[in-house]
């Protein structure tokens, strides 16, 4: 079975490598492509847009689906794109996925009840994105890098990108009941970029007939949004990904070879 692993905003395939390596070792065919504008220059990243990322995810999934059912996995932005692809499949625009693995996938950047926000600016994100489309931010500190390695455009935060994603989220939330593929949700309990509320919301509103929700606890104060590379959770996250892949691959084979009534 093929597995499509979609990385997060501003990041790179590096963040999906622990899962890709574990899935490959378990006998699966893992693909972790770079989204448009990622993995290159800052100019290319800033010139990219959510519509490009969505089109790329759809095209890559369609390409891989030519060889049979695909496990669709995504982290953060990649999880949002995976949900969008799964909804397109539910509408008949794409082949149905074997399963859906959502890693630290935000469905809300902020809420008033329960009260939380990725950043205080996100309460007025459309305005801030117009006034200050790109923020220059400090580098990650050495402790964070050691605990949860990450590669990407860490010195810039493109509010325009986040505003584009936020505009897409209401339609994605409305489409969750369409999804029927088995679902596995993984994130860290202390994630302040993607609060656990998002995981519970996805579990409650997704139409999947089989759902697994895993909130992993870590002691470190660093790297809370990176369950795949965090030194305290990466092995467990990889194990969960492999177990879920085996589960959905087995279900796919059972459906394929089940006797048909005449």
Regions found by a protein language model. Give the residues of each.
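Active-site nucleophile loop of the alpha/beta-hydrolase fold
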Residues: 101-112
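Conserved alpha/beta-hydrolase "acid-adjacent" motif
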Residues: 192-198
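Catalytic nucleophile-loop/oxyanion-hole region of alpha/beta-hydrolase
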Residues: 41-65
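Short beta-strand/loop motif that positions the catalytic acidic residue
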Residues: 179, 185-187, 191
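Short, surface-exposed "cap/lid" segments of acyl-processing enzymes
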Residues: 1-41
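Active-site nucleophile elbow and catalytic-triad environment of alpha/beta-hydrolase enzymes
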Residues: 158-176, 181
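Catalytic histidine-centered segment of alpha/beta-hydrolase-like enzymes
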Residues: 218-236
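Gly/Ala-rich beta-loop-alpha elbow adjacent to hydrolase catalytic centers
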Residues: 74-78, 82
